[in-house]
């Protein structure tokens, strides 16, 4: 396992911790897209169905359990404990616009036509677009809290580091996972504008704001 994957996992975990701490301390989930969090929970669920049948390493197993647990806790807080603060009026992205094409693509483009492999492929494709409801929500409200932007930054950084991981693995092991790499590139592209605003505004102490949709 190379340093890029480790740093990617740390960045991913840090993003989730930032989000959970934000909700726990403020007793509010305002500004957080419950739909994006539902998609991420679905991503981890379909990707880690082999949790109890395939063992790679203690690190791999522990990280799977942590990500699954955090995903379900996040969904519970948004739709359960903190549901009164959930901004459902602005979290209006149509999930079927993502789920239908992702499901179709998972059946058409995969490495092996078996249930577990199709579900794994589904999770990779879905993760690449799961953040769209959150970005749509920010564009709809016109702004985002600083904690939410930090969460999105580390989530985007995780994808960039994982792309570096794939490049490193190809260079050192001649290993290339086309589905994971292409999906990772697509996901990273969605963060480009956000990264620019994060560096030019948030890191300078300014509030991140986006043009309101017409």
UniProtKB/Swiss-Prot annotation:
Organism from which the protein derives: Xenopus laevis (African clawed frog)
Principal cellular location given in the protein's record: endoplasmic reticulum
Region described as Interaction with the K-D-E-L motif on target proteins: spans on this chain: 47-48, 159-169
Superkingdom field: Eukaryota
A GO BP entry: retrograde vesicle-mediated transport, Golgi to endoplasmic reticulum
Region of interest (Important for recycling of cargo proteins with the sequence motif K-D-E-L from the Golgi to the endoplasmic reticulum), ranges: 204-207
Record's protein name: ER lumen protein-retaining receptor 3
Gene from which this protein is expressed: kdelr3
Bilayer disposition of the protein: Multi-pass membrane protein
Lumenal-side segments: 1-4, 53-58, 111-116, 169-178
InterPro entries in the cross-refs: ER_ret_rcpt (IPR000133)
Family membership: Belongs to the ERD2 family.
Keywords (A to Z) from UniProt: Cytoplasmic vesicle, Endoplasmic reticulum, ER-Golgi transport, Golgi apparatus, Membrane, Protein transport, Receptor, Transmembrane, Transmembrane helix, Transport
GO-annotated cellular components: cis-Golgi network; COPI-coated vesicle membrane; endoplasmic reticulum; endoplasmic reticulum membrane; Golgi membrane
Any one GO MF annotation of this record: ER retention sequence binding
Record note on domains: Binds the C-terminal sequence motif K-D-E-L in a hydrophilic cavity between the transmembrane domains. This triggers a conformation change that exposes a Lys-rich patch on the cytosolic surface of the protein. This patch mediates recycling from the Golgi to the endoplasmic reticulum, probably via COPI vesicles.
Role according to the record: Receptor for the C-terminal sequence motif K-D-E-L that is present on endoplasmic reticulum resident proteins and that mediates their recycling from the Golgi back to the endoplasmic reticulum.
Residue intervals annotated with topology Cytoplasmic: 25-32, 80-92, 136-149, 200-214
Localization, UniProt: Endoplasmic reticulum membrane; Golgi apparatus membrane; Cytoplasmic vesicle, COPI-coated vesicle membrane
Transmembrane segments: 5-24, 33-52, 59-79, 93-110, 117-135, 150-168, 179-199
Important for recycling of cargo proteins with the sequence motif K-D-E-L from the Golgi to the endoplasmic reticulum (site feature) positions: 193
Pfam family, one: ER_lumen_recept
Marked site (Interaction with the K-D-E-L motif on target proteins) residue numbers: 5, 117
């Amino acid at each position: 396992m190379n340093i890029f994957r480790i740093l990617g996992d740390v960045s991913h975990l840090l993003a989730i911790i930032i989000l959970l701490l934000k909700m726990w301390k403020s007793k509010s989930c305002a500004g957080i897209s419950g739909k994006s969090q539902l998609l991420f929970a679905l991503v981890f669920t379909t990707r880690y169905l082999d949790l109890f049948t395939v063992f790679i390493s203690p690190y791999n197993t522990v990280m799977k359990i942590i990500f699954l647990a955090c995903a379900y806790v996040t969904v519970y807080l948004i739709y359960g404990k903190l549901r009164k603060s959930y901004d459902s009026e602005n979290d209006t992205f149509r999930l079927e616009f993502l789920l239908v094409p992702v499901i179709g693509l998972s059946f058409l483009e995969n490495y092996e036509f078996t249930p577990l492999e199709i579900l794994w492929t589904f999770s990779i494709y879905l993760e690449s677009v799961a953040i769209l409801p959150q970005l749509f929500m920010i564009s709809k409200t016109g702004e985002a809290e600083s904690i939410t932007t930090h969460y999105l930054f580390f989530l985007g950084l995780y994808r960039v580091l994982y792309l570096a991981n794939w490049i490193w693995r190809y260079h050192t092991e001649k290993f290339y996972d086309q589905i994971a790499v292409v999906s990772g590139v697509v996901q990273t592209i969605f963060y480009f504008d956000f990264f620019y605003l994060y560096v030019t505004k948030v890191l300078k102490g300014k509030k991140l704001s986006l043009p309101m949709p017409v």
